[in-house]
Design a protein with these regions (language model features):
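Phosphate/dinucleotide-binding and metal-coordinating scaffold of catalytic cores
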Residues: 1-231
Length: 231
């Protein structure tokens, strides 16, 4: 049976630097730099995939489980444990069949929300995400998914909250439940922190408290106060 080709375009600072697809015979991705990227002054991966070497005009991804068949510098944009839990729930809710090219679908879902500078197209978009975010509902659902994982059942009334949680949480790295949000200090309004924002909004990573007795969020708060990040 012939597999449908999936192509993901990879962008950096507005420039399409390469195209990524899946080789079902090699069971990994294949990536090719664009001529537009080769004209740029920078080299994003000079040690392993230097653009000056013709041999690396196209190359296969790393089959190691850590990289899921992607080139190492692209695999870094994949969701970690928490984001993967949300993504798996999203696949189930949308009746999407899992295939070996799933890493490409993950990158498309991440789109412009990766923690680094890379962006991926085509991108999944959802207008519902632009609405105000109810932090209490997010925290309750995040705790349910994190603690139940394989058995978490999403009710119809939670479906929109689930969509927002997947959107806000898949790109944030790490194993603990979290979301990237924006907070208006004047009105107290919460929104997605991964879209263009009006004035008076500041972006934060919100870490939700887990159901067990481990004070992980409190410990991280203490460390952040001891060693504040200076921007």
């Amino acid at each position: 049976m012939k597999k449908e080709p999936i192509i993901v375009n990879v962008y950096l600072w507005g420039t399409c630097i390469g195209k990524l697809n899946w080789d079902f015979e090699k069971h990994c991705s294949v990536f090719q730099f664009t001529d537009e990227y080769r004209k740029q002054d920078y080299d994003i991966c000079p040690s392993t995939h230097p653009k000056r070497t013709p041999l690396f005009a196209s190359f296969y991804g790393n089959k190691d489980k850590l990289y899921q068949g992607l080139p190492e510098f692209l695999a870094d944009a994949l969701p970690d444990r928490w984001g993967s839990s949300l993504f798996d729930q999203w696949l189930t809710d949308n009746n999407i069949k899992v295939t070996e090219s799933l890493p490409l679908l993950k990158l498309s879902y991440i789109g412009k929300r990766a923690m680094g500078a890379l962006e991926f197209e085509p991108e999944f978009n959802d207008d519902d995400i632009q609405e105000t975010v109810d932090m209490s509902s997010l925290a309750t659902l995040a705790s349910k998914i994190y603690n139940d994982r394989d058995a978490a059942a999403i009710s119809p009334e939670d479906s929109l909250t689930m969509k927002k949680l997947v959107y806000l949480g898949t790109s944030a790295g790490g194993m603990r439940p979290k979301a990237v949000i924006a907070y208006n200090t004047e009105t107290g309004e919460f929104r997605s922190g991964q879209v263009d924002l009006p004035e008076n909004f500041k972006q934060y990573i919100i870490k939700f408290k887990e159901a067990d007795d481990s004070p992980t969020t409190e410990i991280e708060m203490i460390y952040s106060e001891i060693y504040p990040l200076k921007l």
